[in-house]
Amino acid sequence: MSAAKNININLKIWRQKNAKSKGSMESYKLDNVSTASSFLEMLDQLNEQLVNERKEPIAFDHDCREGICGMCSLYINGRAHGPDTGITTCQLHMRMFNDGDTIYIEPWRSAAFPVIKDLVVDRSSFDRIQQAGGFVSVNTSGRTMDANAIPIPKHDADRAFEAAACIGCGACVATCKNGSAMLFVGA
């Protein structure tokens, strides 16, 4: 891993006063961002700059900052959680960006996640998913083996567990092109 350096970035961030107001992208310039800092630390740095300029800081969700809770979910440059794969927004580091880059930051774009303010969305849709069981059940009329009776090799089970470890970030719902499908429990 290379040594941390400072970069200057341009930010285009979704701003929206409340759920009823119309939002828009606003531009910001942020200098001396350490490539060792996390994406959320960069947003903290921007908010500190805005407060010092007597401007309204950007509202964004976060909690654990360890990739456990899913609260930090954002679209970054049009991708859920940004340019890296297999991570949440809080696990994204600024070393993924270059000096002079323009970074677009938006809240989840889904009817299931209405914007409350800026980058903060209403996540109550996950309560409905959990109440619905979070899966689609199929009536097999007793003609198939019970899934619990089918042995699965440990290697396959370990790989499946990694893919199934949901932290409730909502990326699956926010990015699903089939979000209005009748069987889609997240819609």
Residue ranges of model-derived segments:
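Signature of N-terminal electron-transfer/Fe-S-associated modules in redox systems
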Residues: 1-187
